[in-house]
């Protein structure tokens, strides 16, 4: 099985429930990229990802830098393809960090279809269902987060993850207000998208423990391992 066609489309997403912007920042334009890989057997692999501020720019990286690595390859060689993209990104192309992932998903999708299995069984099934939670984008006010969490709770969704827009004092107001609004029996999580210092993360983490948040996602960038080790020593969440 060989990949013979690499297609992508970018779609400007319609407005979400609420305006999306960092505090004091520009409006966030969350475009969507759709990827389709076609093989000589006729099988197709699909994936979708968000493309941050510009779907047009992301699609150009896909076609000019990533597609040449993928075309003509066996989708079973997905690990080799991923590692090649990782090297190219560092040495040559500098494409957005979120682009290799959906290509990898499309490769997995192809191989699962060839095997005649849903992907979760192809990779080794453990359960056949998972709970769903809603996830926010950056919202301008504390009340917007409260309203969004309550909206999703009213639809029967059991959890909500906030992406507070900063600074840290604003984020802590969001955490407290959302917990008060949804009650103690609703699952809450937060993700500041790598925006904290270590001291800020410890301060916020202690608040989250008191408010019974389920997890504290990405307070630092993924490569700041020392900070994560220190944070784990300081917190129980």
Go through the PLM ranges and name each one.
Residues 150-153, 209:
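Non-catalytic positions within long, well-ordered alpha-helices that form the structural scaffold/packing
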Residues 162, 168-237:
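Catalytic core of soluble alpha/beta enzymes
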Residues 114-140, 174, 179-186:
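N-terminal small/glycine-rich loop or linker at the start of catalytic domains
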Residues 78, 119-122, 215-222:
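Flexible, glycine/charged-enriched surface loops at secondary-structure junctions
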Residues 1-46, 50-51:
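Structured beta-strand/loop patches that form or line metal/cofactor-binding pockets in enzymes
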Residues 3, 42, 66, 103, ...:
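Conserved, mostly hydrophobic/aromatic
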Residues 93, 129-144, 163-164, 192-198:
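Active-site mouth loops of central-metabolism enzymes
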Residues 38-114:
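Metal- or metallocofactor-binding catalytic centers and their adjacent structured scaffolds
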């Amino acid at each position: 099985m060989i990949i013979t066609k690499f297609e992508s489309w970018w779609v400007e997403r319609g407005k979400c429930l609420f305006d999306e912007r960092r505090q004091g920042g520009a409006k966030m334009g969350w475009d969507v990229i759709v990827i389709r890989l076609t093989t000589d057997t006729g099988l197709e692999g699909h994936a979708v990802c968000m493309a941050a501020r510009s779907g047009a720019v992301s699609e150009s990286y896909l076609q000019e830098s990533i597609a040449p690595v993928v075309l003509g390859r066996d989708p079973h060689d997905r690990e080799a393809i991923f590692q090649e993209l990782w090297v190219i990104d560092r040495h040559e192309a500098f494409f957005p960090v979120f682009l290799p992932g959906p290509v990898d998903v499309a490769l997995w999708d192809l191989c699962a279809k060839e095997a005649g299995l849903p992907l979760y069984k192809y990779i080794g099934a453990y359960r056949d269902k998972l709970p769903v939670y809603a996830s926010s984008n950056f919202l301008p006010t504390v009340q917007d987060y409260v309203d969004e969490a309550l909206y999703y709770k009213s639809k029967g969704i059991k959890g909500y993850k906030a992406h507070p827009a900063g600074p840290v004092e604003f984020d802590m107001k969001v955490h407290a207000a959302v917990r008060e609004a949804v009650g103690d029996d609703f699952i809450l999580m937060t993700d500041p998208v790598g925006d904290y210092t270590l001291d800020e993360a410890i301060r916020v983490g202690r608040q989250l423990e008191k408010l019974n948040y389920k997890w504290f996602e990405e307070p630092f960038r993924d490569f700041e391992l020392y900070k994560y080790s220190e944070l784990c020593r300081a917190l129980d969440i």
